[in-house]
Amino acid sequence: VKFKSKFVLAVLCAAVSSAAFAGKDEDQQIKFRQSAYSFTAWNCSKIKSQVVDHPETFNKEQVIAAANSIAAVANSGLGALYGPGTDQGTGWKKTRLKPEFFEKQDEVKKVALSFNEEANKLAKVAANGDIGEIKTQFGELGKACKSCHDKFRIKDE
């Protein structure tokens, strides 16, 4: 029931955010998008530190909070922040979104769903507190992120 309530809340947030951001200019969409991914990266670094790099520091509650934060971003309706023209422009910094993102919507859908599924699985696994399972699922989330980056993100210069 708790998961179902969170799912309904996520769907409502996605609907509201889609409507709210539909009229924002491209740079604002890029800024919001970059903020969401920076927040995700910060939470991933907390999990990596406690599960991969320094498992002796594992704190179940902190890892659960980080995993839930990542899942919240994945369920937040980020697609609304990829409006036409957002492959160019500057948010906090110049976007690295490739123009192919808008040309390959079937592939975009696959990577977006993968990110969503793996983030939600990570939150579920984290709640159980098994560090080995968390590490494995964290790796699966990393693969989902890498898949999108490899296809749709301009490499750092």
Where are the regions a protein language model picked out?
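Sequence context surrounding c-type heme c attachment/ligation sites in exported
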Residues: 23, 27-157
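Cleavable N-terminal signal peptides
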Residues: 9-10, 20
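Short, linear, compositionally biased motifs with a strong N-terminal bias
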Residues: 13-14
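Bacterial N-terminal signal peptides that target proteins for export
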Residues: 1-9
